[in-house]
Regions:
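N-terminal positively charged helical leader segments and presequences
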Residues: 1-69
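Active-site/ligand-binding-proximal alpha/beta "capping" segment
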Residues: 169-197, 201-202, 217-219
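RNA substrate-binding interface of SAM-dependent RNA methyltransferases
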Residues: 71-168
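C-terminal functional extensions of proteins
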Residues: 241-249
Length: 260
């Protein structure tokens, strides 16, 4: 079943009006007709099962059949801080991170980042990454569309992470799987967790020291060296499994929204 997102202001009682590119996609690409069914999420934790009523000018009119609290969000907010990779790797990282439950994605320039983006290029990249995040959220039936932040410096990213409950830094020189297991096991539902991933070439040692001074916890992901596009997704997968296994009902927690 097709899944779309609508701003809460588009929800009016038993009716939802979609606008923008989604209308063209529904009407001209999917060729959805009155009576066909779709899921709509408001980005704030509510899902709506709807029936297409028809199209009016530049809007798709949907009738709400039932609504329920989204059950697809993790019980903790996972924020992926991704060192800028080369080429189009960031697009793939954004897509998969959203599928794995990332709440927000923060790209940053590290000392070993090869890619250098000026303000104009960074803005265009972010728009592209945000569009990919929206598509991935629709495909994976997320209750929110994770935000992709503006590109930051490493220092700005560390300052941003100061408000989080836990900050993890997978590092190839870190040892001790038992220590990593102990750190992961202590993460509680409702906590916010940052994951810092270096670019190709990893982190500079000075960045690791800076992260530790700020309270970040270096962890290991095993004996193998992972690519930058693999390390973050591996960490997200581990955390997703840990949180899902805790079997804590998401409805018992305050619903996170990306408006905060």
């Amino acid at each position: 079943m097709q899944h779309f997102f609508a701003d809460p202001s588009c929800v009016d009682g038993e009716q939802i009006r979609l606008a923008g590119s989604d209308v063209n996609h529904m009407k001209n690409v999917l060729r959805m007709k009155p009576g066909e069914e779709v899921w709509v999420s408001d980005g704030e934790g509510m899902d709506y099962f709807c029936s297409v009523e028809g199209y009016e000018e530049k809007e798709a009119v949907l009738r709400v059949v039932k609504k329920e609290v989204s059950q697809t969000e993790l019980a903790s907010r996972l924020i992926l801080f991704q060192g800028l990779p080369k080429g189009d790797k960031m697009e793939w990282i954004v897509q998969k991170a959203v599928e794995l439950g990332a709440y927000r994605i923060v790209p940053f320039a590290a000392k070993r980042s090869v890619v250098k983006l000026d303000q104009k290029k960074a803005g265009k990249k972010r728009e592209r990454w945000q569009a990919i995040a929206k598509g991935a959220a629709e495909q994976s039936k997320r209750g929110i569309v994770p935000q992709v932040q503006d590109v930051m410096s490493f220092q700005e990213a560390m300052n941003y992470a100061k408000e989080l409950d836990v900050v993890l830094v997978p590092y190839e020189l870190q040892e001790g799987m038992k220590a990593t297991e102990a750190v992961i096991s202590k993460i509680e539902p409702g906590q916010s967790v940052g994951i810092f991933i270096g670019p190709e070439g990893g982190f500079d040692e000075s960045e690791i020291e800076q992260a530790k001074e700020a309270g970040a916890i270096p962890i290991t992901l095993g004996k193998r060296i992972l690519r930058t596009e693999t390390a973050g997704l591996t960490t997200l997968s581990i955390l997703m499994y840990h949180l899902e296994c805790r079997a804590v009902s998401y409805t018992h927690l305050t619903l996170p929204t990306n408006r905060e």
